Amino acid sequence: KLQLKTLLLQRAKRELEREEQERAGEKQRHLGGLCPPPELEGLGVAQLQELCRELHARIAVDEERYDMGTRVSKNMAEMEELRRRVAGGRFVRPALRRVRLSADAMMAALLGSKHRVGTDLRAGLRQVRKDDAEKESREVGDWRKNVDALSGMEGRKKKFEAPGGGQG
C-alpha cells in the first residue's frame, strides 16, 4: 500500500510540474501578443529617445493606476475592519446628546450655510384675541339666563321655588 501511495504522489507531482510549465508557456505567448518587442533596428537617436519617453509615460501611468488601486484596496480593508469592530461591539460608540435647534438653525442646516433664510413659521398661524373669547363667554352666560324665559315655564317654575313649595 505504501509503495502504491508513493507512486501516485510521484505521478501527481510530475503532472503538476507539467501543468505549471504549460501555464508559463501560455503566459509568455499571451504577453508576447499583447506587448510585441519593439523594433529598434534602423532607428535614429531622436527616434529612440522619443520611444523611451513614450514608454516612460506609459510606465508612469501604470504606476499611478497601481498606486490608486493599492490605496483603494487599503481603504476598503480598513473600512471593512471598522465595520467588523462596530458589529463586534469592541468599538465604543459615543453617547449622543439631544441638541435643540431653532427653526432658523434647522433650515440653515438643511439648506446649507450659504442660504440665509429668516422664515417666520408663526406667520401662517391665526391670531386669537382675548376680547373675542370674553364676548363669547358673555353671550353664553346671557343665553343660559334666558333659558327659562324661552322655555315658557316662568310662572310654573316660581311655584316650585316658592318657600311652601305650592303644596299644602
Curated annotation (Swiss-Prot):
Keywords: Actin-binding, Muscle protein
InterPro entries the record matches: Troponin (IPR001978), Troponin_I (IPR050875), Troponin_sf (IPR038077)
Gene3D superfamilies for this protein: 1.20.5.350, 6.10.250.180
GO CC terms of this entry: troponin complex
Subunit structure: Binds to actin and tropomyosin.
Role summary: Troponin I is the inhibitory subunit of troponin, the thin filament regulatory complex which confers calcium-sensitivity to striated muscle actomyosin ATPase activity.
Protein name, as recorded: Troponin I, cardiac muscle
Organism of derivation: Gallus gallus
